[in-house]
Amino acid sequence: YLDNEALSPEIVASIEQRKNRPGWWAVYGEGRLGEVEGKIYKDWEIIEKIPHEARLVRRGLDFGYSNDPTVIVDIYEYNGGFIVDELAHQTGLSNRQIADIIKSREDRVLVMADSAEPKSIDEISGYGVNIMGVAKGAGSVQQGIQFVQDKRMSVTARSVNTIRCYRNYLWKTDKNGKVLNEPEHTFSDPMDAIRYGLNGYRTRPNTPSGISDQRRKQIQRSRYSATVS
């Protein structure tokens, strides 16, 4: 990391705070090859573009403002898995600006957001965005993480912040180095947005996955024609 002049002081400080994690430090501090100890998500595929057959099913929104960025991600269903595409990762965004980013997209799907910001959700809804808060409760974070872990996940190459956070999203450890069942806050923002976006989502039954809405409508029309003929 010392050879990368593009890193901000905040990222450098975050890296150096993890010197006490040998596995992580060996990979990201000293540049050795290997797997990061305590990494929450693994084996995500980085893809150059979203397949034409992929279907946009949700958007995830994690609120931030001054210290933490606001993150918006598109989530596509494709061939039994999900594809993540980063729309925004920026500090200082107002609710109006968040709504404008979402409404600038041609496709309109449900936005799932952090329910800790009910006033922001109401305001963004008032700007014409289909948005709702994610229900939270005991164990909901761990359940959401497990749901994502169980899926085949891909992320677009242009989603540079999401990829960086995916690679650095770790479980907390205690003073003895024991891994705990709680994620670190550092690098969590895009991961939270993804978890919110997939909250409560299930693949539609009897619906062919990995095909576009246009193709799905063609299939439905052909079935109808066969029925009436």
Predicted regions located by residue number:
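Non-catalytic, well-ordered alpha-helical scaffold segments
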Residues: 23, 69, 188-191
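ATPase catalytic-site recognition across NTP-hydrolyzing enzymes
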Residues: 4-64
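Mg2+-dependent endonuclease catalytic cores in nucleic-acid-processing enzymes, primarily RNase H-like
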Residues: 73-74, 78-186, 204-213, 217-218, ...
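Short, structured patches in soluble enzyme cores that scaffold and shape functional sites
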Residues: 1-3, 19, 31, 74-76, ...
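Short, well-ordered loop/turn elements at secondary-structure boundaries
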Residues: 53-55, 66-69, 105-107, 149
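Stable alpha-helical structural segments in soluble proteins, enriched in small hydrophobic residues
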Residues: 189-201
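A conserved active-site cap/scaffold subdomain adjacent to cofactor or substrate pockets
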Residues: 56-61, 65-73, 85
